[in-house]
Swiss-Prot record:
Located at the top of the head of the 30S subunit, it contacts several helices of the 16S rRNA. In the 70S ribosome it contacts the 23S rRNA (bridge B1a) and protein L5 of the 50S subunit (bridge B1b), connecting the 2 subunits; these bridges are implicated in subunit movement. Contacts the tRNAs in the A and P-sites. It comes from Borreliella afzelii (strain PKo) (Borrelia afzelii). Belongs to the universal ribosomal protein uS13 family. One of its GO terms (cellular component) is cytosol. Transmembrane segments: none annotated. Gene3D superfamilies: 1.10.8.50, 30s ribosomal protein s13, domain 2. It holds the Pfam family Ribosomal_S13. NCBIfam families: uS13_bact. The gene is rpsM. One of its GO terms (biological process) is translation. This is Small ribosomal subunit protein uS13.
Length: 125
């Protein structure tokens, strides 16, 4: 079982799919990594030898920001927006959509479950 960037790659999948289990590597980037490391992207992950795993590891660590470092960069970027109190930072802080979507009826994913307002029907009479 290959271990890259602290993640065990799923051994029964093709390399182009197995690499997507690493945070920060999608399908396109997985193909790029395979091409740079001169490894067939359709090769099964459990068939990799140590030399190929080391080449993959070297390409990923030298050229891409992945896993913990990428997560911390994203968190720092969001924190910076919240600190400067720009529109996007305020929306992050309030837990609302950032990109102009309507919030009167939709945005349930971002806002969470509905919160019922007590005595709303009585007050509307």
């Amino acid at each position: 079982m290959a271990r890259i960037s602290g993640i065990d790659l799923p051994s029964n999948k093709q390399l182009k799919i197995a690499l997507t289990s690493i945070y920060g590597i999608g399908r396109t980037r997985a193909l790029e990594v395979c091409n740079k490391a001169d490894i067939s992207s359709s090769k099964i992950a459990k068939d990799l030898d140590n030399d190929e795993v080391n080449r993959l590891r070297k390409v990923i660590e030298s050229d891409y920001v992945v896993e913990g470092k990428l997560r911390s960069e994203v968190a720092m970027s969001i924190k910076r927006l919240m600190d400067i109190a720009c529109y996007r930072g305020v929306r992050h802080r309030k837990g609302l959509p950032l990109r102009g979507q309507r919030t009167k009826t939709n945005a349930r994913t971002r806002k969470g479950k509905r919160k019922t307002v007590a005595n709303k029907k009585i007050a509307s009479k």
